[in-house]
Amino acid sequence: MMGSTFKRKISKVTVKVASPEVIRSWSSGEVKKPETINYRTFKPEKDGLFCEKIFGPTKDYECACGKYKGKKYEGTVCERCGVRVESKEARRKRMGHIDLFAPVVHVWYLKSSPSILSSLLGIQAKELENVIYYGGKRIIEKILIVTNPKDTDFIKGSLLYQTEYEIYNQKLDFEVMPGVIIKSPVAPVISSISGEVKIRHEKTHTDREITWVDVRKISRAEHRVYNGMVLNVKNGDYVNQGDEIVSEMQIDPIYAPFDGTVEIDEISNTITIKPLTTSKDMPVTFSLPYGVKPVVPNNSKVKKGDQLTNGTVLPAVIASVSGNISFGKELNVRPLEDGKYEVLTSGSVYVENVVEEKHYPLFEGAFVYVKDGDEISEGQTIADRFLFEDEYLTLDEYKIFEQHYPAMFTAESEVENDRPIVVITEIDDEVSVETGLKIGDIITDHQYSAYRTLYNDKIEADSGASAIKKLLQKLDLEKLKAEIESELKKVSKSSGRAKKLLRRLKIVKDLLKSETKPEWMILEAIPVVPPDIRPMIQVEGGRFATTDLNDLYRRVINRNNRLKKLYEMNSPEIIIKNEKRMLQEAVDSLIYNGRMGKAVTDRNGRALKSLTDLLKGKKGRFRRNLLGKRVDYSGRAVIVVGPHLKIHECGLPKKMAMELFKPFVLAELLNKDDETSKTARKMKKAIIEKEMPQAYEVLEEIIKGHPVLLNRAPTLHRMSLQAFEPKLIEGNAIQLHPLVCPPFNADFDGDQMAVHVPLSAAAQAEAKFLMLSRYNIISPAHGKPISMPGKDIVAGVYYLTMVGKDYDKVQKENIKWKFSSIDEAELAYEFGHIRLHDPILVKVDDRVIKTTYGRLVFANIVPREFRDYNKTYGKGAIKDLVYKTFKKYGVDRTADLLDDIKDLGFHYATISGLTVSITDFYISPERRRIIDEAKKKISEVEELFALGFLSDEERYRETIKIWADATEKVQDATFEYIGKDPFNPVYIMVDSGARGNKDQLKQLAGMRGLMADPSGRTIEIPIISNFREGLSVLEFFISTHGARKGSADTALRTSSAGYLTRRLVDVAQSVVITTTDCGTENGVRATVLKSSDGLTVEKLEDFLFGRVLAKDVYDPKTNSVLVNPENGKEYTRDTMIDDDDAKFLGNYSVRIPVSRELEINLTNPELPENYCELITDFIYDGVHYDEGTEVNWDIIRKAKNSGLEKLTVKEYPIVGKVSVETVVSQKDIKQLVVDEELIMPTTAKILEGHNVESVQVRPEIIVRSVLTCEAEHGVCSKCYGMDLSNHKIIGVGEAVGVVAAQSIGEPGTQLTMRTFHTGGIATTADITQGLPRAEELFEARKKLKEPEGIFSRVKGYVKDIVEDETGKKKVYIEDEAGDIHEYDIPTKVKVSVNKGQKILPGQSLSTGAIRPRKILETLDVDTTALYLLKEIKKVYVEQGVDIHDKHFEIIIKQMLDKVEVIDPGDTDYLPGDLLRLQMVKRINKQILEENVHVETNRKRVIGKILHQHLIAEDENGEIVEIAPEGVEVTEEILEKAIKSGIKEIIVKNGDGEIVTYQILPKEPIKYRRRLLRITKASLERVGWLSAASFQQTPQVLTEAAIEGSVDHLLGLKENVIVGQLIPAGTGLDMFANIQIEETPRLAQKEKMA
């Protein structure tokens, strides 16, 4: 006995930010190496990404080294290899981690939009990224050079930048001068003149050396001077022409000083006297001056006193020119005491004049190529450079070079620098005040080093993730919250600042609520997912294919290890920073590749898939694996038609069935012999595998009553998956019943279908009783049959029940065959006496009727009361018959009828021998005449145009109209002509509805008519030929546009429709029937839906069908509850309206008077049933009651008490009724009341004033609607009304949201994609239709494709329509109070109302589309909902698609379900938050209830211990503590808390329980209703799981994690994701706990017995 009780295992799923400790707690070990698998052994590397020690063994129950093998060692850790012996399944579960050497920012929190880290820290996102990625800042700053360091540590000549200088200058005393930086100096230095070089050196004011190279070009006058002369001048002196350089000089003779020998040296011009050998004298040498000659011969002996030389006079040397004196190189002089110079060796003295001189300053470090005194020629190089590139100079220094080297270099006084930036993480309070900096400010590293120089350790800054981590650790969230809240009070609610603060406040509150520490957003350790989720697979050729994740992990590990190494090696800061940045980037790529910077790609340039990519999108974890799973016990095959099957059967190929039911067959074979041994199992398996007969016998048994599910993709609605009872067939194709093709949208041109086997008894029961195809005949979209005969069946039935053309002319008495019974007629037919279509007389139910045998045959299968012996059954008639049968007899009889129709239809379609040939397309003789007439009219129009009576636009419109009329006439003539022969096969097909339509027939045998060009504009040349005659070349060419457009359209449509369906399902999936009755008194007024252009979109009866009444319906005549005379049904509240009721109520109206007088007898008064007003006035208690006052019980009581006996009143019976006619005033053309208007007292008085006596009205009908349902979750049965698929009230648990989405989305592919042009030039608005229009409405687009229309905001009349000179139109509307409202009509749209027309609020005054959001803002929710309903419905109705209103209403309800918080009062929500309407109502109710207990709470809280400290803002705006944690609450503390506006105190009870007491009344939430587009509504759902699985997965998850969001699994998707039964249908708790017991053995034994 198996009892299956089902309880929800998971009640909620929470998502949070993981702390580093949590990440490490998940892990089974640290991954230290980037290696994966050893290339030789193919075993995982130790400590690598696939390490067995961390992740578990690769072989089941076997350690890595093989020491322990087998399950008996389970749990043992091998001491050799360290691997724990367990199942290899562990490799899917066990995680590792990587300890990061440097912290890294989690890219989700940085790059969410808007960035969470940025909002929380109050740092701009760009700046924040810059800090994290060690970025820089481009700064243009001035250069300054220290000229006087004074007492500072600066060196003279050192460089400072403006930013540093400003910081130093505040505290230090030193002098600077603006500087410049030298750019592109010309090198080398080349002399521009020939001349002599002079070199000198000097120091600048910054103590730097300049070498001066002077080159001079000189003119010289040479004056020879001789030894012995005395110079009057010295080198460099200036002399004038005629000055004496040397004065005239008398030279005396030389006499011998002693006896000796004379030696004369002519070369050196000397004379020497050597003494005698006996003498003690030393030799004496005389230098002979110029002009002195010896008078004694050489080597002669002389006596003391002998004359040796002659005496002479040396002439004076006179300067021949003025100039500077320069001594020649060979001149040797000796200074004398009187300042003159004696010439020692003869030489030249020059008088020089400088012709040209150049100075070349060279900065220190330049290499000089010349020496002092060198003679150089022009163009010779002096030095390698005069300045270095990027040399910095003070302005004074710059001027020197600027003067000597003009235009040979450029200088910049400002320099652009890329400065690394840092963020301040710590700052002393005093320093903060002094510098104006605070924690979180971003400065450049230059500024930082300046501050560090000045303040030492009182300021700290850092960059990269570690800096952000420090900032986050510094945050005191409680304090921050208080600060933001106090600031919010000071700024305007709508300002941008307020929005920023609110976003920040939300994050702070979320972090507090989820108890998340902000620094957890910075990763210290990274989890490594289990290896089997990122496998490596060996491909042929011995290579390995690996998952992208492994590559990404490898990059992280490599960079992390390299960073460690670099750090240990004490590498330079810049290298370490770069490595840290690379590590950050590697982790970013791992988490979300491509979000920051360029994506990491593989060899082929494909971006690698990161962890985020594994979650998001169609191929992500959510949509691919959690919401879409693969199914076991399934198969697929091609389908073929199975005409012999019953509607609930399908043919299953034997092979396929055997494979699907193999386990069942095996179990049955084993059960038969009660064997369980292994050999028995093997044997029985062999029986199955060898396909022995007994296997098939068992299969036949098992399959009986075991339904299978068939599904055809695309699964657009629930009818695409139905249950059938399988029949075993030969062959390989599944046989499908032809009548279930429409719901599956299947045909037999190669379609495939999938089969699924429901396994458990509960699943089989559901399949059998809910999903069997015979219970799915009626479509849940519109409540009409969908499993319908078509094509050949319709043709067969039509052929069976049709008659010849003379049938009606034959009189009864002239009919040859008369039968006493149907059997007799059958006999005659069998023997060939009569044919199917011969008129015969037959006695049926005691009356003789004229019919045909065919009609008798068909009537035989029809339920008795619907038999009609004189009707030809086409498609429509069959549909009506099926629907009537369903309503009267239910679904089983209907299914049987359908099967009978199918059998008859196929049989007689075969017998009919229907064929088609080209000659069957008769061409009407009228055709030619109609075309000729049209041509004649066209030439008249052309003539008028030529004469200028018509504009081109008018001519075009007329032409189109003429041809359109002609085409229509040809169509009618053709059909009529073909129909003259009822047996014409083409006519049979078209008239029966089997195939083809009048339009196609027109093209084949009439004329093709007008075509559209690619833009959608109609081409004015029609195609006059038809396909039977053949088209001309031009005609064929014109017609290609449409064909091509059609093909392109279809392809586009499919994907758009699919996406629309997906969004609709997403927005509505959680709408389930949760309760039978929400008890609401509200509802919507039933009305005829008319679109803005006045076309009826939906009749009243269709609006009412399937609804439940919210209020009693009163008969306008009698004011009693309305009763249906046909069935006696009373229309009271909670009555469900079926088809017949809807027809009755939709067409019921009566004429009643507008007003009448009435007397109320005050002695025994009764309140009138209708609205009444006083005619006579009276005074009571000093108050005057005038005529026109509404009469109620209060007035009657006062009138009685005032002494009156009778009260005359005017009764208005029409008030509160709905007009079904338009009443126009006789005086002017003003409409007094319009069709479908609810008549109010003012309207009634206006009618009375215009002497209207009576009006045709219907009762006001208020029906329940999902739009007004007040169920907390989902909707209730009564507001939803009828379940359209079975015409009973909907059951609790039905997933009506999904059904609604499918009903709307499924016909999406039938809608057109086109934007039609209203003919002519594009000035008139294009009308958006079909799918784009539906999407525009569901997505509540702000930008519309067509111009925006104008609507009225009041009820009134069009007083006037005025056009000014510029062509702008204005519409003036007079409301019922007589006020005038003016509306400007934009030039792009036309006025769509007329003067005197009555206008209701929300009604269009012009063409163009109206924005639903505008209606919501200016009018109300009901009008908006009705507008959306009308417009969306119109899109589908135009395309001939019938969908019940309630499906649209569910989507509209979801779009309008959210409210926007304007003022959150004292809740934790923020302005701008979107919440569910019912939730807000509940919260507000709760707040108001709790406010009552404030006084009691204040008493209770005294004496309790504070669990959290109390902080508030004091008078100065400072955040202060009122009471610390852990103290006892006293009266004084309570008083302070109340004064500070603290509304709640959290305390500990005596038993340590933590309780929150409210001590001040709280404000409820103020909100406004919002209209959300479906995509937004999907994302704005309560649960994060379903939002994350829809779109923007990373964003949703990021926000949810910060919030610590809890998903209570209320919707369907959430439960599918966690793998539970969905809370709908039998998965609801109320059904889920029903016990289902399966007793297979018992049943078996009974069978045997």
From Swiss-Prot:
Group of enzyme by EC: transferase
Q: Which GO terms describe its biological process?
A: DNA-templated transcription
Q: Name one GO cellular component term.
A: DNA-directed RNA polymerase complex
Q: What is its EC number?
A: 2.7.7.6
Q: Which CDD domains match?
A: RNAP_beta'_C, RNAP_beta'_N
Keywords, A to Z, come to:
DNA-directed RNA polymerase, Magnesium, Metal-binding, Nucleotidyltransferase, Transcription, Transferase, Zinc
The reply to whether Transmembrane figures as a keyword in the UniProt entry is: no
Residues annotated as binding Zn(2+) 2: C1078, C1269, C1276, C1279
Residues engaged in binding Mg(2+): D747, D749, D751
A single GO molecular function term of this UniProt record: DNA binding
Pfam families recorded: RNA_pol_Rpb1_1, RNA_pol_Rpb1_2, RNA_pol_Rpb1_3, RNA_pol_Rpb1_4, RNA_pol_Rpb1_5
User: Where on this chain does Zn(2+) 1 bind?
Assistant: C63, C65, C78, C81
On the tree of life, the source organism's domain of life is Bacteria
List the catalytic activities from the record: RNA(n) + a ribonucleoside 5'-triphosphate = RNA(n+1) + diphosphate
- What does the UniProt cofactor note say? Binds 1 Mg(2+) ion per subunit. Binds 2 Zn(2+) ions per subunit.
The coenzyme or cofactor needed here is: Mg(2+); Zn(2+)
What the protein does?
DNA-dependent RNA polymerase catalyzes the transcription of DNA into RNA using the four ribonucleoside triphosphates as substrates.
Q: How does this protein assemble?
A: The RNAP catalytic core consists of 2 alpha, 1 beta, 1 beta' and 1 omega subunit. When a sigma factor is associated with the core the holoenzyme is formed, which can initiate transcription.
What is stated as this protein's family in its record? Belongs to the RNA polymerase beta' chain family.
HAMAP family associated with the record: RNApol_bact_RpoC
- This protein is called DNA-directed RNA polymerase subunit beta'
